[in-house]
Swiss-Prot record:
Protein name, per record: Zinc finger CCCH domain-containing protein 14
Organism: Homo sapiens
Function summary: RNA-binding protein involved in the biogenesis of circular RNAs (circRNAs), which are produced by back-splicing circularization of pre-mRNAs. Acts by binding to both exon-intron boundary and 3'-UTR of pre-mRNAs to promote circRNA biogenesis through dimerization and the association with the spliceosome. Required for spermatogenesis via involvement in circRNA biogenesis. Regulates the pre-mRNA processing of ATP5MC1; preventing its degradation. Also binds the poly(A) tail of mRNAs; controlling poly(A) length in neuronal cells.
Self-association and partners: Homodimer; facilitating circular RNAs (circRNAs) formation. Associates with the spliceosome. Interacts with HOOK2. Interacts with ZFC3H1 in a RNase-sensitive manner.
Compositionally skewed regions (Basic and acidic residues) per UniProt: 412-423
GO biological process, one term: regulation of mRNA stability
Entry-linked Gene3D superfamilies: 4.10.1000.30, 4.10.1000.40, PWI domain
Modified residues annotated as N6-acetyllysine in this record: 357
Residue(s) of cross-link: Glycyl lysine isopeptide (Lys-Gly) (interchain with G-Cter in SUMO2): 99, 139, 175, 198, 245, 283, 295, 357, 378, 413, 489
Length: 736
């Protein structure tokens, strides 16, 4: 059984619908894979094994359905073949035939006497059409009537969405030529009154296919007149005729695209169907001759479908086939939309879905691509941007800065510039914002100075790169000369306002008129606070306002201090005269409670400090006991040891209430030191027999007295040594 283009499309659409019904349809690749297995004649077990990965529990259900459909198609193909009789031709016999076999398979048959004008055209602006004629092998009247009456209704209910393809096709391409004239033949057909009384059979497909009218030749006409009558019907109705390819289970003729409404196309039919031929063999031989003479682009083609016995192989349509026998009947099929015929067969064409899927994946990968910096980060310090935020964000930092501890970084040389008109406008807006936020005038003045500093910094450093901040030591204090006190106040205010740490760097002076400079120097930097004298402390407080420093980390005090402590610190910052009382400072110190260390108290459970102990007292029992590897240092409760203070096991996992007396481990035996070797020659050498002799014994030369080197450093005995064979020991023989 060959699966043609049309039936392959039908089967594939049915498979796709079934996959969607089972919820296993993802894309077009799975139906393509199933079609390949159908073409390779895979068995049901093989399909079940291959599709179990895709369909899961629905695999057996799907394969049973698919093979049921294929078995029905095979049965439809084999049953009409047993009824064939290829002895006579219908046009050579005078027996009237009222029925013809067309489109047996899965198509629904509707018989009705519809005039040829009842076929509308889906595309009236197009004149192209496809004409197909079918040549049938002769069959007896009884067999034809029996099969048409019984099989048509049966096939209409068995296989609905599919059509069985013609196994193979003979193709004859017909191209119109200027010298092909059949005017006389057409005139004869127009004068024939029988052309208006021709019975028709309309066949409607179950799918979205246009209807086809099948024209039957009258029984009283011979083959030639029947053909001409059909041609006349086609010419009269050509402007409105359209249909699809018709599949005949036994044999069919399919005409490809042809312009029958034009006279030059109709002239091409003279060569094929002329009244000179009196038998079909001569007519077919002439058609083959005409076809072989013209190897030009195809205008229309005459196709004969042959029947093979269950070979199941798909073959390409060939343009040259042998002789044909059988009657010629005609049908018109015009596609609703003319398609461009590809040069390659569908099995060898690229899958469009794969290409579209690859393009979409490529676009997604491009959109997800991010650019990374090529320079590796060498330090892991906090980073702050050069460009500053808006004025509203700066004011928010001012409000937060009131509850924070001011930071003083190592000395910074700062240069501030002020514009003329721009800064006046900004100052007006700043005062309005401050009035809304209800900030005191001192903070407003400081904020204005900081805004000027930020404007200057953003103007000089226009890049958006980040710089690394340096953390200052909390114990450092800066002493500024009296004439530089205003600059120091500005630096302090900047640090209170921003809450950020600033990099120690020199700012580039812009090209502007002379402007006030605020410089912080290292003049008079005192010793660390622990080594400062009282006089130095007095000088510090006279030269600048006191800056309160706490031991909080540079992340801020909110996460480390209690609300009471934050309230006291905020009051201290808001006090302009520095009159923060010692009583309130004592409250701050009392509010700070030391956190317990995560180390077990060695006196527990007999610790006298109770809850005030700085170390951890276990509460919950240990879940890993007795396999706990921490033993007495575990932060959970272990059971009491029954030996308590008398326990001598050093790694006892139990709890000991009383203090144990440490057991001294026995000292390991120390090996006696090796006697030091002396450079003094042993006086008994070479006769010394003491194994632990501390004196020097020279090493013997391996060549002994036979050494020939005059500068040999090894020992050579002065006495004669026995020869080698004399030094060999032999076991004495025992007498029995």
């Amino acid at each position: 059984m060959e699966i043609g283009t049309e039936i392959s499309r039908k089967i594939r659409s049915a498979i796709k619908g079934k996959l969607q019904e089972l919820g296993a349809y993802v894309d077009e690749e799975l139906p393509d894979y199933i079609m390949v297995m159908v073409a390779n004649k895979k068995s049901q077990d093989q399909m079940t094994e291959d599709l179990s990965l895709f369909l899961g529990n629905n695999t057996i259900r799907f394969t049973v359905w698919l093979h049921g459909v294929l078995d029905k198609l095979r049965s439809v193909t084999t049953e009409p073949s047993s009824l064939k009789s290829s002895d006579t031709n219908i046009f050579d016999s005078n027996v009237p035939s009222n029925k013809s076999n067309f489109s047996r398979g899965d198509e629904r048959r509707h018989e009705a006497a519809v005039p040829p004008l009842a076929i509308p055209s889906a595309r009236p602006e197009k004149r192209d059409s496809r004409v197909s004629t079918s040549s049938q092998e002769s069959k007896t009247t009884n067999v034809r009537q029996t099969y048409d009456d019984g099989a048509a209704t049966r096939l209409m209910s068995t296989v609905k969405p599919l059509r069985e393809p013609a196994p193979s096709e003979d193709v004859i391409d017909i191209k119109p030529e200027p010298d092909d004239l059949i005017d006389e033949d057409l005139n004869f057909v127009q004068e024939n009154p029988l052309s208006q009384k021709k019975p028709t059979v309309t066949l409607t497909y179950g799918s979205s296919r246009p209807s086809i009218e099948i024209y039957r030749p009258p029984a009283s006409r011979n083959a030639d007149s029947g053909v001409h009558l059909n041609r006349l019907q086609f010419q009269q109705q050509q402007n409105s005729i359209h249909a699809a390819k018709q599949l005949d289970m036994q044999s069919s003729w399919v005409y490809e695209t042809g312009r029958l409404c034009e006279p030059e196309v109709l002239n091409s039919l003279e060569e094929t169907y002329s009244p000179f031929f009196r038998n079909n063999s001569e007519k077919m031989s002439m058609e083959d001759e005409n076809f072989r003479k013209r190897k030009l682009p195809v205008v229309s083609s005459v196709v004969k479908v042959k029947k093979f016995n269950h070979d199941g192989e798909e073959e390409e349509e060939d343009d040259d086939y042998g002789s044909r026998t059988g009657s010629i009947s005609s049908s018109v099929s015009v596609p609703a939309k003319p398609e461009r015929r590809p040069s390659l067969p569908p099995s060898k064409q690229a899958n469009k879905n794969l290409i579209l899927k690859a393009i979409s994946e490529a676009q997604e990968s491009v959109t997800k691509t991010t650019n990374y910096s090529t320079v590796p980060q060498k330090q892991t310090l906090p980073v702050a941007p050069r460009t500053r935020t808006s004025q509203e964000e700066l004011l928010a930092e001012v409000v937060q800065g009131q509850s924070r501890t001011p930071r003083i970084s190592p000395p910074i040389k700062e240069e501030e510039t002020k514009g003329d008109s721009v800064e006046k406008n900004q100052g007006t807006q700043q005062r309005q914002l401050l009035s809304r936020l209800q900030i005191d005038p001192v903070m407003a003045e400081t904020l204005q100075m900081s805004q000027d500093y930020y404007d200057m910094e953003s103007m000089v450093h226009a890049d958006t790169r980040s710089f690394i901040l340096k953390k200052p030591k909390l114990s450092e204090e800066v002493v500024v000369a009296p004439n530089q006190e205003s600059g120091m106040k500005t630096a302090d205010s900047l640090r209170v306002l921003s809450g950020h740490l600033m990099q120690t760097r020199d700012l580039v002076q812009p090209d502007k008129p002379a402007s006030p400079k605020f410089i912080v120097t290292l003049d008079g930097v005192p010793s660390p606070p622990g080594y400062m004298s009282d006089q130095e402390e007095d000088m510090c407080f006279e030269g600048m306002k006191p800056v309160n420093q706490t031991a909080a980390s540079n992340k801020g005090l909110r996460g480390l201090l209690h609300p009471q402590q934050l309230h006291l610190l905020s009051r201290q910052l808001e006090d302009p005269n520095g009159s923060f009382s010692n009583a309130e400072m004592s409250e701050l110190s009392v509010a700070q409670k030391p956190e317990k260390l995560l180390e077990r108290c060695k006196y527990w459970p007999a610790c006298k400090n109770g809850d005030e102990c700085a170390y951890h007292h276990p509460i919950s029992p240990c879940k890993a006991f007795p396999n706990c590897k921490f033993a007495e240092k575990c932060l959970f409760v272990h059971p009491n040891c029954k030996y308590d203070a008398k326990c001598t096991k050093p790694d006892c996992p139990f709890t000991h209430v009383s203090r144990r007396i440490p057991v001294l481990s026995p000292k390991p035996a120390v090996a006696p030191p090796a006697p030091p070797s002396s450079s003094q020659l042993c006086r008994y050498f070479p006769a010394c027999k003491k194994m632990e002799c501390p004196f020097y014994h020279p090493k013997h030369c391996r060549f002994n007295t036979q050494c020939t080197r005059p500068d040999c450093t090894f020992y050579h005995p002065t006495i004669n040594v026995p020869p080698r064979h004399a030094l060999k020991w032999i076991r004495p023989q025992t007498s029995e």
